[in-house]
Regions:
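Membrane-interface amphipathic segments in extracytoplasmic regions
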Residues: 1-196
């Protein structure tokens, strides 16, 4: 989690949900610890005096983005199960083959930082404000109004690689598999829990 300067605003950064754009909008640099939720200071941020917010993303788009990001970071594969599997099993050419690799071991995929289901952050971070990545250009104004002195404007640009040497189009079967893996995310995404 990341406190927005000296305010009572705390950003719960779900990987691959425009988190770098959010912290940058408030003049902050992204830190690797922004994704953490188990440090003492993170537990302190769960207090009622803090206003916690997060950005939720369409689960299919997030999955493909996480795969692309994993491909771009293969040189940093040690200790990262998804990147190690990509290298060890030749899964760098097709997102569908990558997904099929985890058919019998979904937990191995879902414990990887960039593939952890969004519901984990939603349930454990207890946000009071949920923004949607697909509407972030307008939704961010909710947070900007709470800390106008720090808001520098949102620059929505994808930091993940747009061009990768792999097929990143999911088949219908793969889309169904993603929907099964992230069924709770889809319930939150499509249900009233996140608003419209």
């Amino acid at each position: 989690m990341r406190q927005i300067h000296d305010t009572k605003l705390v950003f719960i950064h779900i990987p691959k949900t425009a988190g770098m754009a959010v912290v940058s909008a408030f003049g902050l640099e992204h830190l690797p610890t922004d994704h953490m939720m188990s440090r003492d200071q993170d537990r302190a941020f769960l207090g009622s005096e803090y206003v916690r917010f997060l950005v939720f993303r369409d689960p299919v788009s997030r999955f493909v983005s996480a795969y692309k990001y994993s491909l771009s970071m293969l040189e940093h594969h040690h200790g990262n199960s998804a990147r190690e599997d990509i290298l060890n099993h030749g899964l760098d050419k097709d997102v569908n083959a990558f997904l099929a690799h985890y058919a019998d071991q979904p937990a191995r995929l879902l414990k990887n930082l960039h593939f952890v289901p969004q519901w984990f952050y939603y349930v454990n971070g207890k946000p009071s404000i949920i923004l949607r990545q697909e509407h972030l250009a307008t939704d961010i104004q909710i947070i900007a109004n709470l800390a106008p002195q720090y808001f520098e404007g949102l620059s929505v640009q994808n930091k993940s690689p747009s061009q990768v040497e792999a097929n990143t189009s999911l088949t219908d079967e793969s889309k169904a598999r993603v929907k099964d893996l992230y069924r709770t995310d889809f319930m939150l995404w499509g249900g009233s829990a996140l608003g419209s």
